[in-house]
Curated annotation (Swiss-Prot):
Protein name in UniProt: LIM/homeobox protein Lhx1
Biological role: Potential transcription factor. May play a role in early mesoderm formation and later in lateral mesoderm differentiation and neurogenesis.
The LIM zinc-binding domain, residue ranges: 4-54, 63-117
GO biological processes: anatomical structure formation involved in morphogenesis; anatomical structure morphogenesis; animal organ morphogenesis; anterior/posterior axis specification; anterior/posterior pattern specification; branching involved in ureteric bud morphogenesis; cell-cell signaling; cellular response to fibroblast growth factor stimulus
The organism of origin for this protein: Homo sapiens
Residue range(s) of DNA binding per entry: 180-239
Compartments (UniProt record): Nucleus
Subunit structure comment from the entry: Interacts with LDB1 via the tandem LIM domains.
Protein keywords: Developmental protein, Differentiation, DNA-binding, Homeobox, LIM domain, Metal-binding, Neurogenesis, Nucleus, Phosphoprotein, Repeat, Transcription, Transcription regulation, Zinc
Domain text: The LIM domains exert a negative regulatory function and disruption of the LIM domains produces an activated form. In addition, two activation domains and a negative regulatory domain exist C-terminally to the homeobox.
Compositionally biased spans, kind Low complexity: 137-148, 315-327
GO terms, molecular function: cis-regulatory region sequence-specific DNA binding; DNA-binding transcription factor activity; DNA-binding transcription factor activity, RNA polymerase II-specific; RNA polymerase II transcription regulatory region sequence-specific DNA binding; sequence-specific double-stranded DNA binding; zinc ion binding
Region feature Disordered, mapped onto this chain: 128-187, 293-374
Tissue occurrence: Expressed in the brain, thymus, and tonsils. Expressed in samples from patients with chronic myeloid leukemia (CML) and in 58% of acute myeloid leukemia (AML) cell lines.
């Protein structure tokens, strides 16, 4: 006994139909959608039978306007890669049906504005950032085939989409000023992860890749295109900044070494022409070589003599206001203009070579009063080398106070 593939009952009729290599009752061969009897031809999918219209409506090419299937007998319009019913291919402003070859402006890939309405209503064009296209136009006019420099130039006309747009609406309103932008699009975290992964693989994706991203993320293809443009621009700026930082780091990390002032200066060797000469090299008309500790009783020539007024570092009085000694007793053999040498003797000693009082020196010792230099030992003795050569000339009264200024 033969059973029907549709109702699973035995076939007792005189006639039967053989569909998909199975036996059917005549009344069981019908469309699963509209329930019409199929006599001449039928279409099947997943074991179900469909009539021609229902099959193309369910599984055929979808209209980009109404999202319904397109029958093979229907007339269609094509714009870029989209297919539309004639009734769906109309202007969204005036509902006029657009004809083949007519210039139009596309919004969100599935809405159209005719040229007349676009030109007459410029505010709509500014708000929605419309881009012109021609029905059935050559693929060279599509954004995919344009030069990369033009892609970056279109950023100023399109909606600015970035991964920080969620919290930057207030700042954007201030920065835009008088210029109006298109509607803002907020990209969620999951969508952003998908876009970043796609950018890491291909920084400039093709239209096919963008269509796949649009299906995965649910975003508009124009939004995805603008996001990739902004991302490429950001990457270029980051590369420029990193290159500038690398040059600056190399400049400060390895500066040129300065050449030494004196080439190949041996240890212990002195700089012969330095700004400060050594004690043994110092010569003048008063001090000869090695004569830094000599005292000249006759004093300098009267034309170059100095007075205490010319010596700014010698105090004119002590803490109590008492003048430092008397100047009315000239030394024997001194010229009257050499009172500065009689008042003080400037000696230059290197550190650690300060003279100490030694009773074996034949020259007299000069005491320094404690009233002049504050709390110090009651009397500090200063001895001068070469005292034997001038000891006979120092015969001034003992109450005179002389101090060696170091």
């Amino acid at each position: 006994m033969v059973h029907c593939a549709g109702c699973k009952r035995p076939i007792l009729d005189r006639f039967l139909l053989n569909v998909l290599d199975r036996a059917w009752h005549v009344k069981c061969v019908q469309c699963c959608e509209c329930k019409c009897n199929l006599t001449e031809k039928c279409f099947s999918r997943e074991g179900k039978l469909y009539c021609k219209n229902d099959f193309f409506r369910c599984f055929g090419t979808k209209c980009a306007g109404c999202a319904q299937g397109i029958s093979p007998s229907d007339l269609v319009r094509r714009a870029r890669s989209k297919v539309f019913h004639l009734n769906c291919f109309t202007c969204m402003m005036c509902n006029k049906q657009l004809s083949t070859g007519e210039e139009l402006y596309i919004i969100d890939e599935n809405k159209f504005v005719c040229k007349e309405d676009y030109l007459s209503n410029s505010s709509v064009a500014k708000e929605n950032s419309l881009h012109s296209a021609t029905t059935g136009s050559d693929p060279s006019l599509s954004p995919d085939s344009q030069d990369p420099s033009q892609d970056d130039a279109k950023d100023s006309e399109s909606a600015n989409v970035s991964d920080k747009e969620a919290g930057s609406n207030e700042n954007d309103d201030q920065n835009l000023g008088a210029k109006r932008r298109g509607p803002r699009t907020t990209i969620k975290a999951k969508q952003l992860e998908t876009l970043k992964a796609a950018f890491a693989a291909t920084p400039k994706p093709t239209r096919h890749i963008r269509e796949q991203l649009a299906q995965e993320t649910g975003l508009n293809m124009r939004v995805i295109q603008v996001w990739f443009q902004n991302r490429r621009s950001k990457e270029r700026r980051m590369k420029q900044l990193s290159a500038l930082g690398a040059r600056r780091h190399a400049f400060f990390r390895s500066p040129r070494r300065m050449r030494p002032l004196v080439d190949r200066l041996e240890p212990g060797e002195l700089i012969p022409n330095g700004p400060f000469s050594f004690y043994g090299d110092y010569q003048s008309e008063y001090y000869g070589p090695g004569g830094n500790y000599d005292f000249f009783p006759q004093g300098p020539p009267s034309s170059q003599a100095q007075t205490p007024v010319d010596l700014p570092f010698v105090p004119s009085s002590g803490p109590s206001g008492t003048p430092l000694g008397g100047l009315e007793h000239p030394l024997p053999g001194h010229h009257p203009s050499s009172e500065a040498q009689r008042f003080t003797d400037i000696l230059a000693h290197p550190p650690g070579d300060s003279p100490s009082p030694e009773p074996s020196l034949p020259g007299p010792l000069h005491s320094m009063s404690a009233e002049v230099f504050g709390p110090s030992p009651p009397f500090s003795s200063l001895s001068v080398n070469g005292g034997a050569s001038y000891g006979n000339h120092l015969s001034h009264p003992p109450e005179m106070n002389e101090a060696a200024v170091w």
